[in-house]
Amino acid sequence: MRILDFIVKGQSLTKNPDCDFGNIVAGTRGYLSARFQFYGNEWNTCKKAASFYLEDREFAVLLDENDSCLIPNEVLVSDRFEVSLTGLKNDMLIKTTKAKVKQEVV
């Protein structure tokens, strides 16, 4: 399993510069996962979901207790996909920017 690491600061989502996002090959299934590292208190105790986008389609996945999830196979078929996060706590809803992930099509 390969893990792609992301950083969350408030409403900003970025790729972790210490993580290798190179040589990701489209068509992978059940292999890629995403892990999110949170800075700040905004996200504490929120229920969190990652949304993965391919063109205009969205695929949402709840994060596990390690703030990770499997990346849906549906977005792993093109030369890129995007990801964002949503958090919900009581009446508060928080969303992040999108991060783009490139893939090699072979």
Residue positions per predicted region:
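N-terminal assembly/attachment segments of tailed bacteriophage virion structural proteins
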Residues: 1-106
